[in-house]
C-alpha cells in the first residue's frame, strides 16, 4: 500500500520589539538569566498586563505580508497549563478571534509552484526557558517569558519534507523583509512544530496526526518529517494504529521519541482574558500599517528578472534574504553591472560567508568596495583571478579595492612588450609544446598559458596572453 503524507506546520516567531508584549521589561536576547523580568512576567498577585501596541502592529504587518485578512474585532484568551517556565500557570494567547486568518504563500519545489494556505496568525506571549542539568534538577530562566510572539498555522497543504523546507524558507524570507523579527532559529526567534499524518493515496479523510517538536533547524524539520513518514507507514503496514501524540525529534539519532499523549484545546480550558479589553482595528489603522510593508521577495524577484534581465534562478537566490538583496541593490547603486554583481554575490561572496560562518555585515565587504572591484575587472586593471585575491582582502580587512590593488602590486600586466618578452622565454624552454600545437594538440596552448600566468603570478592579461602566444608560435 502506498501512502500520501499530509503536513501542517506551526511556526512561532518572536517579534523584534523593545519591550515585552504585556510588560515594560526588555525583550532582548542574550541577557543574564532572570534579569529581563518584572512582576508581571513573574505572575505576582494583583499585577495587570498592559498591551504593547507595537507588538499588535508587527502582528498586523506580518499577517498582511502573508496575505491574511485582518480581523476587525480580536481579543486575547487565557490558555491554562502548569509548567515551571510559566509562572502564571496560564499563557495569554488568542483562541477564537486571531488577528489574521485565511492567508497563503507560494512556494516552488522542483520547478513547480504551489500555494500553501495559512489558517491563522495570532499573537501570544512566549514562555520562559528550562535548562535540564545532569544533576537531577532544572534551571528556569524567565527572561523569555512575555516576549511577544506570532504563531503562524498553515493549512494541511504540505505533502513532503521538501515542500515543508521550501515553505519555511519562504516564510522566513517574507517575515525578515517586513522587519518584525530577526527569524534566527539558533537564537530561538523562529521555532517550528510539525503535524504529520499519512493516508492511503486517493483517500480523502485525514489520518491520525502526530505533533513533532524539538525541530531546531530547517534541516531537522526535513529529517524529522522523513523519519516520521517511514515510522507511521511501518506501523500501519504491520497492522498497528497511529496514536495522536506529541513526539520529540532526537538530533543525535535522527529518530523521534514519545513525549506525551497529545492534548486537545479542551485540556487548556481557554477563556477570554479578563484583564485585557477587546481590540477593534479600523480601516485607517490597517492602511497605515500596510503602507509600512516594504517590497517583498516575490515582487523584488520579478523586478530583477524584468528590469535587470537576471535569470530567474539568480533573482530567486538574491532575494532569499533581505540582507543579500539590499546589498545587491546598493552595489548596483555604486555603479556595478547587475550580472557581474549577481555572479560575485552568488559565487565567491556566498562561498566565503558559508566557509567563515558569517553574515555580510560581519565582513569588511561593502557595496562600494565590491562595486569598485567589479569596475577594475571591467576596466582590465585586474583579472578575474586576481580579483579573487582582492575580494578576500576586502572581505577580511575592508578598505578600497583600487588601493588594495596598488598596495599589493596586483595590477594586471597588459604591456605588450613585457608580455612578449616573457612568452618568448617560455617558448624557448618549451619547444615540444610548439611542436604539439602545430600537430593540432590544443592542450599545448593551455599548458603554455598556464606557464605565463605562473611566471607573472597570475597578473598577465589572459586574452592578451592567448593572442600573443598564438602570434609568437606561428612565427616559429
UniProtKB/Swiss-Prot annotation:
Catalytic reaction equation(s): L-glutamyl-tRNA(Gln) + L-glutamine + ATP + H2O = L-glutaminyl-tRNA(Gln) + L-glutamate + ADP + phosphate + H(+); L-aspartyl-tRNA(Asn) + L-glutamine + ATP + H2O = L-asparaginyl-tRNA(Asn) + L-glutamate + ADP + phosphate + 2 H(+)
Highest taxon in the source lineage: Bacteria
GO function term, MF aspect, one: asparaginyl-tRNA synthase (glutamine-hydrolyzing) activity
Family: Belongs to the GatB/GatE family. GatB subfamily.
Keyword annotations from UniProtKB, A to Z: ATP-binding, Ligase, Nucleotide-binding, Protein biosynthesis
Taxonomic path: Bacteria, Bacillati, Bacillota, Bacilli, Bacillales
Name under which the protein is recorded: Aspartyl/glutamyl-tRNA(Asn/Gln) amidotransferase subunit B
PROSITE patterns from the UniProt entry: GATB (PS01234)
Natural source organism: Listeria monocytogenes serotype 4b (strain CLIP80459)
NCBIfam families: gatB (TIGR00133), PRK05477.1-1 (NF004011), PRK05477.1-2 (NF004012), PRK05477.1-4 (NF004014)
Subunit structure: Heterotrimer of A, B and C subunits.
Keyword Electron transport recorded: no
SMART domains: GatB_Yqey
GO BP terms: glutaminyl-tRNAGln biosynthesis via transamidation; translation
EC number annotated for this UniProt entry: 6.3.5.-
Gene3D superfamilies linked: 1.10.10.410, GatB domain, N-terminal subdomain
InterPro entries listed in its UniProt record: Asn/Gln-tRNA_amidoTrfase_suB/E, Asn/Gln-tRNA_Trfase_suB/E_cat, Asn/Gln_amidotransferase, Asn/Gln_tRNA_amidoTrase-B-like, GatB, GatB_C_1, GatB_Yqey_C_2, Gln-tRNA_amidoTrfase_suB_CS
